[in-house]
Amino acid sequence: MAWRSCFMKWTQINSINASSLCPKSTRLNIHPQQRCGFRKTERPSESKKGVQETEAEAGGHNRAVPPKPVPPLPPRRPHQLFRPLVFTVGFTGCSFGAAAILQYESVKSRVQLAIEEAKEEKRDTLLEGHDTTYWHNWWNQLSNFQKQVILLISAVDDFWSGLSEGQKTVTGIIALNTVVLCCWRVPAMQRFLVKYFTSNPASKTRCLPMVLSSFSHYSVIHMVVNMYVLWTFSSSIVSLLGREQFLALYLSGGVISTFVSYVFKTATGRLGPSLGASGSIMTVLAAVCTKIPEAKLGIVLLPVISFSAGNALKALVALDIAGLVLGWRFFDHAAHLGGALFGVWYIGYGHELIWRKREPLIKFWHELRNMSPGRPGPGGGGG
C-alpha cells in the first residue's frame, strides 16, 4: 500500500505542474492586448471562453484573460445641431447682406475717387515741370541705402499692381491662414486653437469654430495645397461675382460645409475635430466649374493631361461620395461634398434668389446713411 500511495502522490504532483503551464502560453497567444493598458486581474476572475479545455484539465485553478471590451459609440444627440443650424442660416444671410452694403460703399468710393483723380491730373499738368526738377534734386540727396530701400518698395508696389483683383483678395486670406498656422507651433496657444479653430459637433463650442476652422491648418502641406487651389481659381471667381460677393460665398461655404460635416458625424457617431479651408475652396471650385464647365483644367506635375472643369467637378463629387460610403477618414468628405453642392446651388439658383434681390437692402442702407446727421459718406455726400 505504501508504494501505491507514493505512486498516486507523484502522479498528482506531475498533473498539477503540467496543467499550470498550459494557461500561461494560452494567455500570451490568444490575448496579447493585455499589454495595451489593462491592469492584471486576479486569476479567479478571468474569462472561461479561451481555455475551456484547460479548465477541465487543471480543475478550475487557472482561467483566461478577459478580451478587450469594445468601446461604445458616442451618444447621438441631434438636438445639439439646432444652434449650429440657426448660426449657419444667420451667418449666411448676414454675409451676403454685408457684402451687398460693402459693394455699394465701394462703388461710391470709386466714383468719388475717380472724380478727385481727374481734378488732380489737371493740377499736376500745370506743375509738371516744377515737380520733375524737385524730385530729381531730392533723389540725388539720398544715400545708396535709402535708394535701395525705395527701389525695393517700388518693386513690391509694381508686383502688387500687377495682381488681379481676385489675387489681391486671396492674398489676405492666405496671410490669415499663415498666421494661424504659425500659432499652431506655439504650445501655449494650442488649447485655445483646439477649442475655437477646430470644428467638432461633440464640443461645447460649436458655432464660432464653424467660421474660424476655415482659416486653420495644422499641416504646412495641407495649407499650401489649399491656398494654391484658391489662388488658381481666385481671378475667375472674382471676375464672375465681384470681390464682395466672392467673400460672402467663401465664408458661407465654410460654415455650410462644416454644418454638413456636423450632421454626418452626428448621424454616424464618428465624432471628431476637423479643420481646414477645403469646404470653402470646394464651394469656390464648384461655382467656377458650374459657371464655366467647358474651361480646361490641368495638373501641375502633369501639364500634358487636361480635362474640362465640368468633368473635374463630377470626379471630385464622386470621390467624396465614395469616401462617405466606404468610410474613409483621412479627409472630411462630408464637408467637401457640402461645400461643392452649395457652390453648384448658388450658381444655379442662389445668385438669382439672394444677390439679385438685394436692392431693398441697399435702399434701406442708403436712407439710413442719409438720416445720420453730420456723417458724410465715403464720397462726402449721401447721394
Curated annotation (Swiss-Prot):
Similarity remark: Belongs to the peptidase S54 family.
Composition bias, Basic and acidic residues: 39-52
Spans annotated as Disordered: 35-75
GO terms classed as biological process: signal peptide processing
A GO molecular-function descriptor: serine-type endopeptidase activity
EC number: 3.4.21.105
Transmembrane segments: 84-104, 169-189, 220-240, 246-266, 272-292, 299-319, 335-355
Membrane topology type: Multi-pass membrane protein
Reactions performed catalytically: Cleaves type-1 transmembrane domains using a catalytic dyad composed of serine and histidine that are contributed by different transmembrane domains
Functional note: Required for the control of apoptosis during postnatal growth. Essential for proteolytic processing of an antiapoptotic form of opa1 which prevents the release of mitochondrial cytochrome c in response to intrinsic apoptotic signals.
Cell compartment(s), UniProt: Mitochondrion inner membrane
Mitochondrial intermembrane compartment spans: 105-168, 241-245, 293-298, 356-383
Chief location of this protein within or outside the cell: mitochondrion
Topological region Mitochondrial matrix: 38-83, 190-219, 267-271, 320-334
Species whose genome carries this gene: Danio rerio
Catalytic center residues: S278, H336
Name of the protein in its database record: Presenilin-associated rhomboid-like protein A, mitochondrial
GO cellular component, one term: mitochondrial inner membrane
Pfam family, one: Rhomboid
Transit peptide location on this chain: 1-37
